Amino acid sequence: MAESEAPIIEAGKVSKWLTDNGFDHEFLAPDHQGIEIIKGNRDFLIPLATALYAYGFNYLQCQCAYDAGPGEDLVSMYHLVKVSDDVEQPEEIRLKVFVPRDDPRLPSVYWIWKSADFQERESYDMYGIIYEGHPNLKRILMPEDWVGWPLRKDYISPEFYELQDAY
């Protein structure tokens, strides 16, 4: 193999199952712990998430977001776990969905995994990703009147923000 060629990484078990069942996605790679990472399309997030739930991923351990860089996409990431009684090391997968920063909309997975409630609210509060269909999408950490999305890489901090007296 030439030095410039990257090694071919074989798709993981879940990615193969999704492909066999006709679910559009892209296998990215396993992470440093060997957890399979897949990329989903925002237009098909709900069918893909429902398929993963049907596969057995019944627990959303973490939903978070990050900014891929100034001018780049925002990413909503879902860490899913297959929880059962007799498994010492449960199966895990990470699903990433990339959304353009000028139209950061995704369907909410709250109706599949209730644990997405506060996590999607935090991603909305910090990055401005709008989770359509979420039952209570509003700021959770920042004051309601805060302008902007503080964890975006292109965010400009206000020089002064007046804290209001709570008394």
From Swiss-Prot:
Subcellular location: Cellular thylakoid membrane
GO molecular function, one term: quinone binding
Topology class, membrane: Peripheral membrane protein
InterPro entries registered for this protein in UniProt: NADH_DH_suC, NADH_quin_OxRdtase_su_C/D-like, NADH_UbQ_OxRdtase_30kDa_su, NADH_UbQ_OxRdtase_CS
Class of enzymatic activity (EC top level): translocase
Catalytic function, reaction form: a plastoquinone + NADH + (n+1) H(+)(in) = a plastoquinol + NAD(+) + n H(+)(out); a plastoquinone + NADPH + (n+1) H(+)(in) = a plastoquinol + NADP(+) + n H(+)(out)
EC number(s) from the headed UniProt entry: 7.1.1.-
NCBIfam families membership: PRK12494.1 (NF009141)
Assigned protein family: Belongs to the complex I 30 kDa subunit family.
Name of protein: NAD(P)H-quinone oxidoreductase subunit J
Gene coding for it: ndhJ
